[in-house]
Design a protein with these regions (language model features):
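Active-site loop-to-helix "anion-binding N-cap" substructures in soluble metabolic enzymes
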Residues: 1-383
Length: 383
């Protein structure tokens, strides 16, 4: 059963109790939310449902807790932060008190407004799509709304099993926008430029294969390009390589669409001495070298293609940007994409590290769409 559109069916949900699956998997340090992008992205759907007089049960996972009720993975800080963003009271259903679904349901039935369940991964069966947990979650509400794009491709009880129990099911407004934006990538205006980075070519090959015929150019950076260099018989020194991806790339070696870096920022490991950082052509890489960023000639090369684009999608950093010595390439390309978006080109950026890099430029607001789910974005685009 397909998820229905929320806007078109708002009369059917008015005044009802809604189970709203959101993605509040955000960084929390010392019980404080450190980055609230995902929370802010959820506000439109929450406010829409509140305007329709709905009682809302918010539900999300957070991290990978090893034991139920682990305070480190509690959503209590999220409840506090979200309440401020919404200027609304939120009843937080702490797992230590509310782990029994009869007690949870009684509390919800007696209350009104907004409720936030504690971490869904505290409940047995969330990650293995337990029908029993799905039934318990479905029993809390009259309507199901999925606004968690990042987990929409996963077989989780709060995404999949819950829908076995015949609740009317809708797409949240954020999920709707995610899909609309990604559909523009699947039906792009030309020239269409794909920028792919990261460490594992094996995780990116499905999307490269799916978009290959539509793409004008595919610009590759990060450690995933080392597979191509190895296949070409080039030395990659001590650079990271995804050995699982070596066989996959052979058919792309002679492609004129695939654009590889021509130089790199390199760390040379010297025994008993300080590591040396330098710019080298790919053909000059030595046995003790690690390629950790694209070089200046590559930045100019990539910029030339990006400036021609009418549609751009970017996933994955182009170097080890978390180190100041190796962030320049990723940051400059992020600026290029942001500068062209919301006007000359339609730009979509996705993936946790990619968004983090974009945020370092202070230009994220100019990008047409920043996806809340890197893995989900890749899954959707790769079909």
């Amino acid at each position: 059963m397909k998820l229905q559109d929320l806007h078109k069916n708002y009369k059917k949900i008015s005044g009802r109790t809604v189970f709203l699956r959101v993605d509040f998997n955000v960084p929390i340090i010392k019980s404080v939310v450190k980055e609230d992008f995902k929370l802010r992205q959820s506000l439109e759907t929450i406010n829409f449902l509140l305007s329709k007089k709905c009682k809302i049960i918010l539900a999300s996972h957070l991290g990978q807790p090893k034991k139920a009720g682990d305070k480190k993975y509690s959503l209590a800080p999220v409840a506090k932060h979200l309440a401020k963003l919404l200027a609304e009271d939120i009843t937080f259903l702490d797992y230590k008190k509310y782990s029994n679904f009869k007690i949870i349901k009684k509390k919800i039935d007696q209350g009104s407004g907004l409720f936030l369940l504690d971490n869904l991964r505290f409940f047995k069966g969330e990650e293995n799509n337990s029908k029993e947990l799905g039934k318990h979650l479905a029993s809390l509400a009259e309507v199901y709304v999925n606004d968690a794009f990042a987990v929409s491709h996963r077989a989780n009880a709060s995404v999949s099993a819950i829908r076995s129990f015949k609740l009317p099911a809708y797409k949240g407004l954020l999920l709707e926008e995610e899909l609309k934006s990604l559909d523009k990538i699947l039906n792009p205006k030309k020239p269409f430029v794909v920028v792919m980075g990261g460490s594992k070519i094996s995780t990116k090959i499905p999307i490269i294969e799916k978009l290959y015929d539509k793409a004008s150019y595919i610009l590759l950076g990060g450690a995933l390009v080392n597979n191509f260099y190895l296949a070409q018989g080039l030395n990659i020194g001590k650079s990271l390589v995804d050995r699982d991806g070596l066989k996959i790339i052979k058919k792309y070696l002679s492609s004129k669409k695939i654009i590889l870096p021509i130089d790199a920022i390199v760390k040379t490991i010297i025994k008993n001495k300080k590591d040396k950082i330098s710019i080298k052509k790919i053909s000059e890489i030595g046995s003790n070298d690690c390629m950790l960023d694209i070089g200046p000639a590559t930045i100019l090369l990539f910029s030339k293609y990006i400036k021609k684009a009418k549609t751009i999608v970017w996933n994955g950093p182009l170097g080890m940007f978390e180190d100041d010595n190796f962030k320049k390439g990723t940051i400059i390309i992020a600026r290029e994409i942001a500068a062209l978006s919301s006007g000359k080109s339609f730009g979509v950026v996705g993936g946790g590290e990619t968004v983090e890099a974009l945020n370092l430029t202070g230009m994220g607001k100019y990008v047409d769409w920043i996806s809340t789910g890197g893995g989900a974005m890749l899954a959707y685009l790769s079909g």
